[in-house]
């Protein structure tokens, strides 16, 4: 609606930056929290933020700061949900099936990342954006209801407070000791920062420069 590459870039930055910053520390807390509750409340928080986005769009608010704030809040919820989900897999799966299930999990996740934009782009043609957001809310609520039916074993609680410096140092040493991991991590980070602004321009190139339509 605003036809502003800057606005879209800022929205994507608002969705990425909290994960980049908080992701360094989220795992420290997730390892000490109840995984099931962490995922449950993260999903509820994401659903609440998405519902607020639905209301903001439906009411016709034009102040983009609302969108940036709610997008950043959704990103914060995802920052804690993702490591809690990954940390729950070893608690649910027998050790001899762990490699196979982990591979299936990442395959499904990769498939979702590919198919979701296709489905989303198709829905944009037929539905207003606010109703597409409602689908996301329904999905988050369904995930919460599913979690209520799943029993995730709890780890023994510890009273030791997180030592960020120690754990980050151990993480850094592990990255350096494992051959190929550190260069891969650096390359992935650099590629993400370089390509993200470029990807945001593709819709505008299609609509404004090539005079395409939403479906294209």
Where are these regions (language model features)?
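Substrate-agnostic recognition of the 12-TM MFS/MFS-like secondary transporter fold
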Residues: 12-30, 34-49, 66-125, 135, ...
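Helix-loop junctions on the cytosolic side of multi-pass membrane transporters
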Residues: 60, 87-92, 129-163
